[in-house]
Amino acid sequence: MDTTRLKDFFTGLQSRIVAELEAFDGQPFRTDSWVRPEGGGGISRLIEEGDFFERGGVNFSHVTGKSLPASATAVRPQLAGRSWEAMGVSLVLHPRNPYCPTAHMNVRCFVASKEGEEDVWWFGGGMDMTPYYGQREDVVHFHQTCKDALAPFGDEVYPKYKHWCDEYFFLKHRNEPRGVGGVFFDDLNEGGFERCFELTQAVGNAFTKAYLPVLAKRREMPYDERERDFQAYRRGRYVEFNLVWDRGTLFGLQSGGRTESILMSLPPIVKWRYDWQPEAGSPEAELYEVFLKPQDWA
């Protein structure tokens, strides 16, 4: 399979998103190109201590290999003995202001090949938002943008991917969701290659429309140490999910991926507290009681 068209889309998407984020923040992203000795490489774009973003990364990677790691063949035995390539864009953004949510987006494609046999391929991706102080209109906007992006592919797609997102970004050991969700899909190959590629493009292209208006609305909201402290505590959940449950992180580390790029998703300042509970009736309690309850936002 010729994957040039895929690569052109993913690298273009990375460039467009970074340009919008640089315009929003005012500071440039660092560019770090890297080569993977086992095959492939990527471009990491990173901001740390920006005017608005405390830390953020927008990664493109295109990695190849002769055989797959255990995390992949355990769930898909048919992939054993196949060479593979994985390609995509992954980003996580951590604003400094606690009233501005963290966001994650990922779009990717995977192809596994064996001489004399048809390629096995699929797309995956999605986006989700993790507020610290929830605002209903922000969550509705984020979900409505996701819904609109997926509407051309059928009315059933958004509800299915929204539910999948709620299930995937869930901390089983805490019995709570990571945030307010969004959309998530994986192993997508039904309907043919073109439809799957178009759907993946639609998700990637919708990200800044879903997220930047939320940030623009909240970026000037005043905050103090109380809000920063709660933000750092809740960021701990983000770290727990990424290191314990996230399939992409585990695949990257097990397949000899670039550790600096894989762990770029982690926030810079995080706190843990033993058995901490929010004060009844507080804005912090509202996050748990209202926003960390999966519901129909759009």
UniProtKB/Swiss-Prot annotation:
Name of the encoding gene: hemF
Task of the protein: Involved in the heme biosynthesis. Catalyzes the aerobic oxidative decarboxylation of propionate groups of rings A and B of coproporphyrinogen-III to yield the vinyl groups in protoporphyrinogen-IX.
Family annotation (SUPFAM superfamilies): Coproporphyrinogen III oxidase (SSF102886)
Residues annotated as catalytic: 104 (proton donor)
Protein name in UniProt: Oxygen-dependent coproporphyrinogen-III oxidase
Organism: Dechloromonas aromatica (strain RCB)
InterPro entries in the record: Coprogen_oxidase_aer, Coprogen_oxidase_aer_sf, Coprogen_oxidase_CS
Record field: transmembrane: none
Recorded GO MF terms: coproporphyrinogen oxidase activity; metal ion binding; protein homodimerization activity
